[in-house]
Design a protein with these regions (language model features):
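Long, terminal "pre-/pro-" and other extracytoplasmic accessory regions
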Residues: 2-6, 17-136
Length: 136
């Protein structure tokens, strides 16, 4: 009986602490706030959700940005709108121009980046922007 009660309490605590909580934008780490203000000058922060290891930010233009808990971005999704090249200024303009498409999502990968383009193509690069692969 005590074992069942203990397991139920553990399960309840896990469910309780695993949920995202809504926090004010001021709770974002400074580097996350700077990233947003530098790259999305006309957009405002509409919603910030925090969980145990990340922040999920939604801007008023629909853009979604995921940050790790330290404030470093891990994914930027423009929701089918072109992302600003200022996110990765040495890489993004080169990819957009060479493939004649707009970048609508960018994610950090282990050794580089994954870009999703407006023509549904996915491009994988190393940290310097050298294309490693692509897929539809």
């Amino acid at each position: 009986m005590k074992l069942k009660l203990g397991l139920a309490a553990l399960l309840g605590a896990t469910v309780l602490f695993a949920r995202d909580i809504i926090v004010p934008a001021s709770e974002l780490p400074r580097n996350a706030q700077d990233f947003i203000s530098k790259n999305f000058k006309t957009a405002q922060i509409a919603l910030v959700k925090k969980d145990i290891d990340s922040y999920d930010v939604t801007l008023n233009d629909g853009t979604e940005i995921d940050f790790i808990i330290t404030g470093e971005w891990k994914d930027v999704d423009g929701k089918y709108k072109a992302l600003p090249n200022s996110i990765l200024p040495n890489i993004m303009p080169k990819i957009s121009a060479s493939l004649n498409a707009q970048i609508i999502e960018v994610s950090r990968e282990i050794n580089g980046y994954k870009f999703e383009l407006s023509n549904q193509l996915k491009i994988y690069t190393d940290a310097q922007g050298n294309i490693l692969g692509q897929k539809f």
